[in-house]
Amino acid sequence: MGVFNYEAETPSVIPAARLFKSYVLDGDKLIPKVAPQVISSVENVGGNGGPGTIKNITFAEGIPFKFVKERVDEVDNANFKYNYTVIEGDVLGDKLEKVSHELKIVAAPGGGSIVKISSKFHAKGYHEVNAEKMKGAKEMAEKLLRAVESYLLAHTAEYN
């Protein structure tokens, strides 16, 4: 089994604490609201939101995937860190066993933040991971982040 790493950094004008609170801690409710064209629903099927929690995420029509099942691995409120693993779903196809993500939001000069994501694509057997698949995951995450960011800019009193 090979492991393929992908890292990305995305700047945001939203301060780290506010972005973590909205995008991560309340993301299950907020993201389907602000990006229904991407995510139609997030359902907690086990756990209290902390490590071990299992979530079913259903994609909107028009997205090439139907659903994923994620396991929360770590939530660190003090350091704005969130780790989770995609453990099921058609996004994995027949070549991936799982995809682990480490997300950290850090303060940026000027009051904004930087969202750092490190992803590990765990291939089944000797399969290689298509670079387009990794790029597609980054683009979807950025689209969701921008939707949350736009919402927060329009609703300045929320998530403070």
Swiss-Prot record:
<keyword id="KW-0020">Allergen</keyword>
<keyword id="KW-0611">Plant defense</keyword>
<dbReference type="GO" id="GO:0004864">
    <property type="term" value="F:protein phosphatase inhibitor activity"/>
</dbReference>
<dbReference type="GO" id="GO:0006952">
    <property type="term" value="P:defense response"/>
</dbReference>
<dbReference type="InterPro" id="IPR000916">
    <property type="entry name" value="Bet_v_I/MLP"/>
</dbReference>
<dbReference type="InterPro" id="IPR050279">
    <property type="entry name" value="Plant_def-hormone_signal"/>
</dbReference>
<dbReference type="InterPro" id="IPR024949">
    <property type="entry name" value="Bet_v_I_allergen"/>
</dbReference>
<dbReference type="GO" id="GO:0010427">
    <property type="term" value="F:abscisic acid binding"/>
</dbReference>
<protein>
    <recommendedName>
        <fullName>Major pollen allergen Car b 1 isoforms 1A and 1B</fullName>
    </recommendedName>
</protein>
<dbReference type="GO" id="GO:0005737">
    <property type="term" value="C:cytoplasm"/>
</dbReference>
<dbReference type="GO" id="GO:0038023">
    <property type="term" value="F:signaling receptor activity"/>
</dbReference>
<dbReference type="InterPro" id="IPR023393">
    <property type="entry name" value="START-like_dom_sf"/>
</dbReference>
<dbReference type="GO" id="GO:0009738">
    <property type="term" value="P:abscisic acid-activated signaling pathway"/>
</dbReference>
<keyword id="KW-0568">Pathogenesis-related protein</keyword>
<dbReference type="Pfam" id="PF00407">
    <property type="entry name" value="Bet_v_1"/>
</dbReference>
<dbReference type="GO" id="GO:0005634">
    <property type="term" value="C:nucleus"/>
</dbReference>
<comment type="similarity">
    <text>Belongs to the BetVI family.</text>
</comment>
